[in-house]
From Swiss-Prot:
One of its GO terms (cellular component) is cytoplasm. Its cofactor is dipyrromethane. Keywords: Chlorophyll biosynthesis, Porphyrin biosynthesis, Transferase. HAMAP family: Porphobil_deam (MF_00260). Monomer. This is Porphobilinogen deaminase.
Length: 313
């Protein structure tokens, strides 16, 4: 058994919360381990002047940490799973999917207005094309404004009066104790989340069996089924965090239900579909369900929507 572990993480407040949470959970199970953090600045942390959709680079928040993992400078990397590309670099693997926090998105508004009660032509801050597409499908009058930076930075910009409302993931808002600022939690029939939203992905080297064995204790089986289904769907659609794709899977007693959305950036076209599979006994079967739903979306015309988006990115 190893005596020391080094966790690689970004330095944002939310990333540090995630890494400290992972450290605490591992220490609870393995009190003899000496666990330290190594902070890594990623491309996504540096390039703050451009919208994520314009940078067009997969792994903006992960690949720099993965370089340290491949070089054996760290033993594991802790990521927000929604930031992790669906294909990991050769020699690396997502070993654990931690138990998922609430996956929904939230609205933060100036006077507590809910989404549909926001004023005409309201300025909504989000860096996500997925959110933009679904917002504009409901309210074409909204002006969508790009916002970058960590959660504290975003709240500072919002409080300075730049926007009428801001959309964020509930998980991050809750973890950093901003829950009292939430005006509305959006249900999945209104806003489907990003693939993997609310879960942490713990990445290790494939050949580091000792670390994989240690980290595997943090894996949450239901979350793994759900996230592997969602990630398989995204992989088959050849999407990423810069593409308007949303998905949410639930899994209970061997039954997986997967909802998915693909839309145009302007919100004028939106496809939704779902699939239910029973008797699942392995995460690989969950992935097969994700691929099956992706194929159905492609038949509906998702390929035309996504091809058009890629031309302009």
């Amino acid at each position: 058994m190893k005596k020391q572990l080094i966790i690689g993480t970004r330095s944002s407040p939310l990333a540090l919360w995630q890494a400290e949470f992972t450290k605490a959970e591992l220490s609870r199970h393995y009190p003899e381990l000496d666990i330290t953090l190594k902070l890594v600045k990623t491309t996504g942390d540096v390039l703050l002047d451009s919208p994520l959709s314009k940078i067009g680079d997969m792994g903006l928040f992960t690949k720099d940490i993965e370089k340290h993992l491949i070089a054996k400078e760290i033993d594991l990397a802790v990521h927000s799973l929604k930031d992790v590309p669906t294909s990991t670099p050769e020699g690396l693997i997502i070993t654990s999917f931690t138990e998922r926090e609430d996956t929904r998105d939230v609205i933060i508004s100036r006077s507590g207005e809910t989404l549909l009660n926001l004023p005409q032509n309201a300025r909504i801050a989000t860096s996500s094309l997925r959110r933009m597409s679904q917002l504009l499908s409901m309210r074409p009058d909204f002006e969508i404004c790009d916002i970058r930076g960590n959660l504290n930075t975003r709240f500072k910009k919002f409080d300075e009066g730049e926007f009428d409302a801001m959309m964020l993931a509930y998980a991050g808002v809750f973890r950093l104790k901003f829950s009292d600022r939430i005006s509305e939690i959006l249900p999945h029939d209104v806003m489907l989340p990003a693939v993997g939203q609310g879960a942490l992905g713990i990445e290790t080297r494939v050949d580091d069996e000792q670390t994989r064995e240690i980290v595997r204790i943090l894996n949450h089986s239901n979350t793994e089924y759900c996230c592997r289904a969602e990630r398989a769907l995204l992989r088959h659609l050849q999407g990423g965090c810069q593409i308007p794709i949303g998905a949410y899977a639930s899994f209970k007693n061997g039954t997986l239900k997967l909802l998915a959305f693909v839309g145009s950036v302007n919100g004028k076209i939106g496809l939704r579909n779902e699939i239910t599979k029973t008797g699942l006994v392995s995460p690989e079967q969950a992935e097969e369900a994700g691929i099956e739903l992706a194929k159905e979306l492609l038949k509906q015309g998702a390929d035309e929507i996504l091809s058009e988006i890629r031309k302009t990115r």
